[in-house]
Amino acid sequence: YKINRLHLHLTDAAGWRIEIKKYPLLTEFAAWRTDANWKTWWNGGRKYLRFDEPGASGGYYTQDDIREIVEYARQHFITIIPEIEMPAHSEEVLAAYPQLSCAGEPYKNADFCIGNEETFTFLENVLTEVMALFPSEYIHIGGDEAGMAAWKTCPKCQKRMKDEHLSHVDELQSYLIHRIEKFLNDHGRRLLGWDEILKGGLAPNATVMSWRGEEGGITAVTSGHRAIMTPGGYCYLDSYQDAPYSQPEAIGGYLPLKKVYSYNPVSTSLSAEQAKLVYGAQVNLFTEYVPTPEHVEYMLYPRTLALAEVAWSAPERKSWPDFHARALKAVTDLQAKGYHTFDLKSEIGSRPESLQPLTHLALGKKVIYNAPYNSSYAAQGDVTLTDGIRGDWTY
């Protein structure tokens, strides 16, 4: 299927998943939480435990595990790209090493303290061990969803802003990204990050992974940077792939095979030269609602195959009927090899009501909104309530 990259999201609030010898608490404490069920844990206090305490749930890859995985991938012509989250999504680190947070206490912050020089010592030490394990050209540093609230009142962060002549807290994230990029570049690696790394000014050689739609990727390539396209509406496989009532619990949304296949990673707004900077496309599967390896396979296949074909095919050569027929066969072949795929031949498909127009007295009338609607569910914008169109499984 010509899938040639595996991006491993190795750290997040739910647990630290890679052995770092210089910081043993990452695997003795930050890798273990109070409940195996993510939703129960997330809604129930979000606490961590030592690995040897009763009820501890979690785990991690040893460095020997990583070497074995990297070698297996190499034999199958796949490069593994590791991700170490910074500056946000770091609750687990800051519970184990609270001195790296603005508060200096566990369970207070999710973001590293950018004003603390020890933060950079920690991150560089971690990345040094990571680079020794992964030969990938790219090292992914996260960069998404930083809260930044603590930085506004943290004396160390405010001093950093003054010393570096920064005018907004967004620039603190940019400061961190620039420093980490230089460190990676000095070691012969490229920095890759989610599209929030554009905030405050993009690091000189950074590659942007565009997940909040395509805008971040387009901004990157039009300014001469590389981009990887992975917009949530087409590429996040933790959404339902069929009618939600027929599927295991998922994070929400509706992303069927056909929609993944419809994606074009290279925007028609780009020039030929800019298009060359779109280096690829990627599907993502976050596993908060995916508790077993079998469930992972179910969510991945066959939708991953659709993105693989999209990434390697010129848009004019794509044919949904042809791909769908081949996907049915691919599912049969994968199941024969022991994979637990989605049963494509039994797909329910779009919500029937979404294909039936609705007639009512307000059809086409202007709607006045007293409060803004949630942009995540914008649908058809101001005319959504009066356009006569019913929603699909997403909304």
Give residue ranges: language-model regions:
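Disordered, acidic Ser/Thr/Pro-rich linker "stalks" and the adjacent N-terminal cap
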Residues: 354-395
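Generic domain-boundary/flexible-linker signal
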Residues: 17-19, 91, 150-152, 202, ...
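Substrate-binding cleft of carbohydrate-active enzyme catalytic domains
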Residues: 1-189
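Short, low-complexity intrinsically disordered segments
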Residues: 14, 30, 36-40, 149, ...
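Surface-exposed, flexible loop/turn segments at secondary-structure boundaries
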Residues: 14-16, 88, 147, 199, ...
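Residues that flank catalytic or metal-binding motifs in active/ligand-binding sites
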Residues: 22, 108, 204, 277, ...
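Residues that line or immediately flank small-molecule/substrate-binding pockets and catalytic motifs
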Residues: 10, 285, 371
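Substrate-binding groove of N-acetylhexosamine-processing glycoside hydrolases
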Residues: 68, 77, 120-138, 145, ...
